[in-house]
């Protein structure tokens, strides 16, 4: 006869059910464990990016090296893109997914660090503080909200394609006004993605997909930061 004492371990059938469903429908302790993993990984990613950027800003030799070799930004960006593709293919392969996660974060951190060397340190600090405040506020709002944000996905991805196209056209028709408008729209777009991805990690992902959840939020943070940085510089030029 099965033991119904709550002190006994749960059955494997219950575990299979919880891990086969989305996070929101899993048991409380699985939800909390998932969130701890996601935000612990995310915190380490942001920490690595912050430290790397600070080193590039502090040491003049690194700044000079980047300014003399701006193609490094493209190399790091392409490396990040390739690693994202590999992570998508091996998202459930442990511990390979964690090794790929570290490599991706390092590559992305180097790309961001290279970019910020072209900006004033004061503007970088402002953008960092604004990004942190916005992310924490939107995360708190989304996690306690009862609204279904998945319906905004199509609009957000359409907006992303439009933003990419506008960014390409900007290469040929650059103006400070266009830079300001695109930076503003980009920042608003990635605020939307933070809400969408925070909602999705609870309602669309399974508990074992914490690596993908962390990467999605990390990319939202990086893109929000970079667009805020562009916005602040554009405003500063006016």
Curated annotation (Swiss-Prot):
It comes from Mus musculus (Mouse). It is found in: Golgi apparatus membrane. The keyword Zinc-finger does not apply. Keywords: Apoptosis, Golgi apparatus, Membrane, Transmembrane, Transmembrane helix. Anti-apoptotic protein which can inhibit apoptosis induced by intrinsic and extrinsic apoptotic stimuli. Can modulate both capacitative Ca2+ entry and inositol 1,4,5-trisphosphate (IP3)-mediated Ca2+ release. Its main location: Golgi. It comes from the Eukaryota. Belongs to the BI1 family. LFG subfamily. It is a multi-pass membrane protein. One of its GO terms (biological process) is locomotory behavior. Residues 1-38, 90-97, 142-151, 197-208, 230-238 are cytoplasmic. The lineage of its organism: Eukaryota, Metazoa, Chordata, Craniata, Vertebrata. InterPro entries: Bax_inhibitor_1-related. GO terms for cellular component: endoplasmic reticulum membrane; Golgi membrane; Golgi stack. This is Protein lifeguard 4. The gene is Tmbim4. Residues 209-229 dip into the membrane without crossing it. The keyword Transport does not apply. Residues 60-68, 119-120, 173-175 are lumenal. The chain crosses the membrane at residues 39-59, 69-89, 98-118, 121-141, 152-172, 176-196. Interacts with ITPR3.
């Amino acid at each position: 006869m099965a033991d119904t004492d709550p002190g006994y371990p749960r059955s494997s059938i219950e575990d299979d059910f919880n891990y086969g469903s989305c996070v929101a429908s899993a048991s409380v302790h699985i939800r909390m464990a998932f969130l701890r993993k996601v935000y612990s990984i995310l915190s380490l990613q942001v920490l690595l990016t912050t430290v790397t950027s600070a080193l590039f800003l502090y040491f003049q030799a690194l700044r000079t090296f980047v300014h003399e070799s701006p193609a490094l930004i493209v190399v790091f960006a392409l490396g990040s893109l390739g690693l994202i593709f590999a992570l998508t293919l091996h998202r459930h392969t442990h511990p390979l997914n964690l090794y790929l996660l570290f490599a991706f974060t390092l590559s992305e951190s180097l790309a961001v660090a290279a970019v910020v060397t072209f900006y004033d340190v004061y503007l970088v600090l402002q953008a960092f503080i604004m990004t942190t405040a916005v992310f924490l506020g939107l995360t708190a709002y989304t996690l306690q909200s009862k609204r279904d944000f998945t319906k905004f996905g199509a609009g957000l991805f359409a907006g992303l394609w439009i933003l990419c196209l506008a960014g390409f056209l900007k290469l040929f028709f650059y103006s400070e006004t266009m830079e300001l408008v695109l930076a503003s729209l980009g920042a608003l777009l990635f605020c939307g993605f933070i809400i969408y991805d925070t909602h999705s990690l609870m309602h669309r992902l399974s508990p074992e997909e914490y690596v993908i959840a962390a990467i999605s939020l990390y990319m939202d943070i990086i893109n929000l930061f970079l667009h805020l940085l562009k916005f602040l510089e554009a405003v500063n030029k006016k």
